[in-house]
């Protein structure tokens, strides 16, 4: 028996049903790599960030996520080079889908019970995605903006439903917009932390604090 088409599991009808001690025998998801490209590039290397955002409330199979990842990666490797981008998959397939197998051969009615005991066996995993939730994000240099958008446009064809491509106003994968990031960086308030940054709050030495207290209460 072949794999049941993913269109049968497209909509979020049931509650989340993750793998657990009650839900055993779940096959491994097809997607195993969620970060690829130049993952260790510093936050300064890749200021551009582009998101592929879902425009529907639906379920995406792990096979579709893997196909989209491969499609995006192949295009960027060919037209940008393998060290000029960092792709991050933003969805993880945790929801388990079930199948109630039915026999279709002659005399099947003697062997099976139809819809009696119809709670199926685990068949695969899908990711539940909301409207406005990013499916995948790419950070790169500004000179490769057109190539990144085209790679995500091609990856859209691997997913059901509608998606939109957003060019983020933020610096890379950080939470700061570009102007704000440059201000904080010039003030030495940011500390690089892999592909992100840590904010250094205004904590002075204790002597400076004591002096300020004396000035206030003098």
UniProtKB/Swiss-Prot annotation:
CDD domains: Ribosomal_L16_L10e. GO terms for molecular function: structural constituent of ribosome. It comes from the Eukaryota. Coiled coil: none annotated. The keyword Mitochondrion does not apply. One of its GO terms (cellular component) is cytoplasm. One of its GO terms (biological process) is cytoplasmic translation. The keyword Repeat does not apply. Keywords: Ribonucleoprotein, Ribosomal protein. This is Large ribosomal subunit protein uL16. Component of the large ribosomal subunit. Mature ribosomes consist of a small (40S) and a large (60S) subunit. The 40S subunit contains about 33 different proteins and 1 molecule of RNA (18S). The 60S subunit contains about 49 different proteins and 3 molecules of RNA (28S, 5.8S and 5S). Belongs to the universal ribosomal protein uL16 family. InterPro entries: Ribosomal_uL16, Ribosomal_uL16_CS_euk_arc, Ribosomal_uL16_dom, Ribosomal_uL16_euk_arch, Ribosomal_uL16_sf.
């Amino acid at each position: 028996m072949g794999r049941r088409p993913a269109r049968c599991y497209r909509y979020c009808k049931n509650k989340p049903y993750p793998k657990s001690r009650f839900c055993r025998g779940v096959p491994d998801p097809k997607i195993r790599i969620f970060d690829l490209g130049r993952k260790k590039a510093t936050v300064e290397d890749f200021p551009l960030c582009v998101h592929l955002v879902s425009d529907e409330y639906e379920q995406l199979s792990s096979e579709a996520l893997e196909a989209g990842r491969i499609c995006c990666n192949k295009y960027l490797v060919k037209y940008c080079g393998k060290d000029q981008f960092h792709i991050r998959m933003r969805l993880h397939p945790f929801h388990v889908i079930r199948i109630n197998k039915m026999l279709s051969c002659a005399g099947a009615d003697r062997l099976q019970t139809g819809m009696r005991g119809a709670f199926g066996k685990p068949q695969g995993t899908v990711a539940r995605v909301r409207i406005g939730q990013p499916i995948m994000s790419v950070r790169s240099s500004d000179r490769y903006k057109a190539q990144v958008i085209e790679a995500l446009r091609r990856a859209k064809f691997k997913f059901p439903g509608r998606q939109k491509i957003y060019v983020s106003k933020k610096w890379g994968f950080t939470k700061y917009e570009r102007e704000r990031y440059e201000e904080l960086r010039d003030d030495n308030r940011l500390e690089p932390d892999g592909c992100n940054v840590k904010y250094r709050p205004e904590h002075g030495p204790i002597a400076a604090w004591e002096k300020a207290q004396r000035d206030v209460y003098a």
